[in-house]
Curated annotation (Swiss-Prot):
Key words of the record: Host endoplasmic reticulum, Host membrane, Membrane, Transmembrane, Transmembrane helix, Transport, Viral movement protein
Protein name: Movement protein TGB2
Membrane-spanning intervals of the chain: 15-31, 68-85
Remarks, miscellaneous: TGBp1, TGBp2 and TGBp3 seem to act together for cell-to-cell propagation. TGBp1 is the main movement protein that physically cross the plasmodesma with the viral genome. TGBp2 and TGBp3 would facilitate TGBp1 function.
Organism encoding this protein: Strawberry mild yellow edge-associated virus (SMYEaV)
């Protein structure tokens, strides 16, 4: 009885990962996280005005969140880019660049 290697399941795992990511992306894109406004028949999640003979509702919709400034994400990206650039230029007494001439043998 010859020994055989176990089957390769990497493609199966890759397909499962793509399917799971697709399901999560579709779920996140179709889920509404807006607050519920109105009654069981009339929903105004984006704001609006409704009135009939017995009831009326006026809702202006969700506004921007005042606790996070609008320029903060751009500022964080800029700080990260500058930090990465500065860390690549600083000398931490470790030479990561190859200074040997093994790859440059044009004289031979």
């Amino acid at each position: 009885m010859p020994l055989t290697p176990p089957p390769d399941h990497s493609i199966t795992y890759r397909i499962l990962a793509v399917g799971l990511c697709s399901c999560c992306a579709i779920y996140a894109a179709t889920r509404s996280t807006l607050p519920h406004t109105g009654d069981n028949l009339h929903s105004l999640p984006y704001g609006g005005k409704y009135s009939d003979g017995t009831k009326s509702i006026c809702y202006s919709g969700p506004g921007p969140t005042p606790d996070i400034p609008t320029h903060l994400p751009a500022l964080l990206v800029l700080v990260l880019v500058v930090a990465i650039y500065a860390s690549s230029r600083l000398d931490f007494s470790v030479n990561y660049r190859c200074s040997c001439r093994v790859h440059n043998r044009s004289g031979q």
